[in-house]
């Protein structure tokens, strides 16, 4: 069964219909049933609970979460894919126990009302809000972001009710199961990768702002600068040689770490590609790119790492959500540069959502002294 186009899915979404979205096989490898939150009813909640069987959640933008006064469920998110649960919610009025389909639909309506504020909800409750990353699927290739993106693209409030699809035996539904589900219920099915493609055809969260030659001790690179539209940060790409989409390119996506790249702190491990080591490797082969991403580490976090250097070698510890943001940003830059296949300078890792950017890691090269 071929996937439906994102344009067709958006049209169904505009009409208040449900959609199925499948994520990367290297990520959760699951499908979620999504519905514009503005179109949520007791009947649709009942259908989700009965047919999809997963946890019914509400995707909201960061701005909307702030307006409702929603705090994260835990201060430090340790989930594998950094799904940003807030404390669960209930409508402040118009509900009984809160768990019925009608009560949950009422809670969704109260939360997504354009004039909603903290007084309109209570906590905890039976609806689980998920905070989407700014930039949507271009920043994080998850169902949370996809739900907000689809609703926005369809002209609704950027919020969706979503639920994972499970099989009768309680196992997660994979693509063959999801195709059967879609046919049975007449629901269109697509992929997050295609949604990324769709958005990239008209928009970016990083834009190229400059280019010049840059002489270094390792030779002359082309220095290309990019501005991050989300946080105003500046990212750089240092390119040597001619990059071609069908030819594997030596690539390092590198987040500046002052202790390692400026002071020379010695970190051990296969991911210990310093900026200078990566540039040297690219120069030795004569072709490749080192993408240098802005470091969002706070001054306090940096100071806390200094005493640790005398205890044991440590990696620059970034949150999983930050890593996913970096993957999305780096992927957009690589696509802009014309890279298709990557010989990645770093340990073997699976990066979610790369297929949406037409990127494929064909080789991983660990650091060796």
Identify the role of each PLM range.
Residues 1-369:
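Catalytic domains of riboflavin
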């Amino acid at each position: 069964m071929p996937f439906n186009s994102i344009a067709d899915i958006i049209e169904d979404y505009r009409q208040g219909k449900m959609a199925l979205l499948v994520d990367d096989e290297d990520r959760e490898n699951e499908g979620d049933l999504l519905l514009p939150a503005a179109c949520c009813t007791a009947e649709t909640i009942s259908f989700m609970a009965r047919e999809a069987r997963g946890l019914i959640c509400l995707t909201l933008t960061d701005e909307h979460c702030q307006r409702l006064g929603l705090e994260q469920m835990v201060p430090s998110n340790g989930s594998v894919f950094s799904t940003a649960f807030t404390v669960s919610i209930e409508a402040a009025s118009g509900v009984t126990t809160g768990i019925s389909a009608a009560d949950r639909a009422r809670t969704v309506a109260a939360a997504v009302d354009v004039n909603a504020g903290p007084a309109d909800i209570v906590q905890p409750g039976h609806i689980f809000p998920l905070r989407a990353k700014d930039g949507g699927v271009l920043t994080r290739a998850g169902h949370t972001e996809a739900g907000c993106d689809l609703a926005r693209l369809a002209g609704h409030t950027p919020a969706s009710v979503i639920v994972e699809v499970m099989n009768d035996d309680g196992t997660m539904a994979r693509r063959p199961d999801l195709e059967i589900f879609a046919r049975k219920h007449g629901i269109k099915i697509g992929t997050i990768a295609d949604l990324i493609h769709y958005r990239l055809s008209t928009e970016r969260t990083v834009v190229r702002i400059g280019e010049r030659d840059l002489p270094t001790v390792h030779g002359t690179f082309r220095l290309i600068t990019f501005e991050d539209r989300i946080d105003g940060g500046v990212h750089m790409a240092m390119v040597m040689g001619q990059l071609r989409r069908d030819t594997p390119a030596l690539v390092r996506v590198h987040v500046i770490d002052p202790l390692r790249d400026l002071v020379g702190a010695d970190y051990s491990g296969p991911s210990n590609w310093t900026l200078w080591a990566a540039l040297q490797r690219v120069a030795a082969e004569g072709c490749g790119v080192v993408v240098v991403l802005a470091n969002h580490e706070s001054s306090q976090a940096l100071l806390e790492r200094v005493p640790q250097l005398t205890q044991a070698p440590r990696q620059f510890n970034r949150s999983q959500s930050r890593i996913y943001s970096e993957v999305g940003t780096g992927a957009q830059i690589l696509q802009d540069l014309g890279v298709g296949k990557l010989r990645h300078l770093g340990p073997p890792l699976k990066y979610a959502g790369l297929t949406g950017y037409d990127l494929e890691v064909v080789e991983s090269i660990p650091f060796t002294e």
